[in-house]
Amino acid sequence: MTLNEKKSINECDLKGKKTLVRVDFNVPVKGGVITNDYRIRSALPTIQKVLNEGGSCILMSHLGRPKGISISEAAAVRSAGKVPGYEEAATLRPVAQRLGELLSKPVVFAPDCLDAADVVKKMSPGDVVLLENVRFYREEGSKKEEEREAMAKVLASYGDIFVSDAFGTAHRDSATMTGIPKVLGHGAAGYLMEKEISYFSKVLGNPPRPLVAIVGGSKVSDKIQLLDNMLQRIDYLLIGGAMAYTFLKAQGHRIGTSMCEEDRLDLARSLLKKAEDRKVQVLLPVDHVCHTEFKAVDTPVVTADADIPDGHMALDIGPKTIANYVETIGKCKSAIWNGPMGVFEMTPYSKGTFAVAKAMGDCTQKNGLMSIIGGGDSASAAEQSGEATRMSHVSTGGGASLELLEGKTLPGVAILDEKV
């Protein structure tokens, strides 16, 4: 699978136009306060481009998973003086305030995304409007295309141009991701979307070799398609996290009370056979950091080899495994990482994950390694380890990056115009 280049915001005539930008402002909010504004900051270059070119910007996003109401129920709610579908925990109002601070200019907040025509009419070049959470309406994520289209038609009526900068939701067929470009008949990629497409097309197309995939997380079953697809492309596979114990048991090792998918042992064996047939070198843990319970302790047990003692569960890769994995990363020219090596949220079990992050950061800076972190837990681990800024690319999309690595097409990318 190759990802074709998409029409860029650079190729759009933005002057005097109202540009609808689908962003991903799904940020963590506690008590009305944003605890991490990384996703807001990531969208700034695209927003600034629209404003610098003499256009105005209408921003759309979701936040969280509100219940939402249907468009047909909205009129009655509005006539009662309320905002349709409103949930305080999911409002984008704090985001409008933070965005205004980052842009050093006021951002107008439209409290009902489907009743914002009057707000939009008053816009002048240089203005920024943020619409309230698009998921306050069920049609945003409806399974029925006609329902998504009904919502998309209202939103499309606000603007002239559609730009998508929300890679994090590119795997979803929604009113704002695929509906609006269908209604308008066009769509371009913002800078963040462009960067994501560029890096994933490199790693899935013709990457500098050798290419290593570092795959962790808890379940083999969650990563079957990813492993199957990536085994056609990679030179090395490093396996960590709880999924490693299913592979080790499949090879006949003792795994104590470690997490294991007993019904996936044959699958693990078939994946290892596939790797052998394709001449992919697979590295599994040769030692472990263990404890009798799932909790942080000052002195966890480090095993001498790949076998885990009875009554113990492995919670991180051990020092010999770390050395093997770091050495392998050092041999490579490209690396893609999806899933932690252990329970990195607990300090005693974070060494494996953070060592992989550091090795990738070091090799990127010193050897020119092309390093890509698939979003989700791996992105959080890269952030926590302090290595995120030393990587080539940390993806903003957990689910979207996983689906790309599985070889799937992302609806929110496919709908955009091809680069001419």
UniProtKB/Swiss-Prot annotation:
Stored Pfam families: PGK
Keyword Phosphoprotein: no
Binding site for AMP: 219, 223, 242, 314, 345
Biological processes annotated in GO: gluconeogenesis; glycolytic process
Any one GO molecular-function label of the UniProt entry: ATP binding
Binding locations of CDP: 217, 222, 241, 339, 344
HAMAP family to which the protein is assigned, alphabetical: Phosphoglyc_kinase (MF_00145)
Protein name (Swiss-Prot/TrEMBL): Phosphoglycerate kinase, cytosolic
Organism expressing this protein natively: Trypanosoma congolense
